[in-house]
Amino acid sequence: VADMAGIDRRTAKTINLGMMYGMGKGKLSSELGLDRDETEDLFAKFHANVPFVKQLMEQATRKAENVGFLRTLLGRKCRFDLWEPRAFGIHKALPLWEAEKEYGRDLKRAWTYKALNRLIQGSSADMTKKAMVDLYEEGIISHIQVHDELNCSIESKEHATRIKEVMEHTVELKVPLKVDAEIGPSWGEIKKK
């Protein structure tokens, strides 16, 4: 995405993650140390060169607003069942019947601006969990899962290679998954590298 947008990786990552979490231009300005005009130019350049990111975000948000859920890559539902007033302000998101009682009927689904993030994080979790099951079926048991990392005790480098292969092919995608495998006496020692 950074190459497509014509900006450095750190900036592209900040914009991407910021969009997924609903970061506004003011927050982006302070994160990147830019003034308002520089931020506007950067945002325009990013969206002109990488329009699919904003389109995907808007599509996910619309679906969450209209249907109340999204399905992850493996079909799990990410629900948006809480409601809040349409009027701008700080309001507690509530189940529909409570929200109607508290705020009236002019409501919208809460947190839908985070729909793309929920879709990506949920799909990543699906793939990691499926890889754990696939590995278990081959007799390789993970001890710990941290986000998209698995910690396993193995007997040989061949096992590490097999773990890498299973994780890369647990879900076949158009864009290949790349997995790093590291071997060490403990997870702590590997993380120090």
Model-inferred region functions:
Residues 1-193:
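Conserved catalytic core of nucleotide polymerization and phosphodiester-bond processing enzymes
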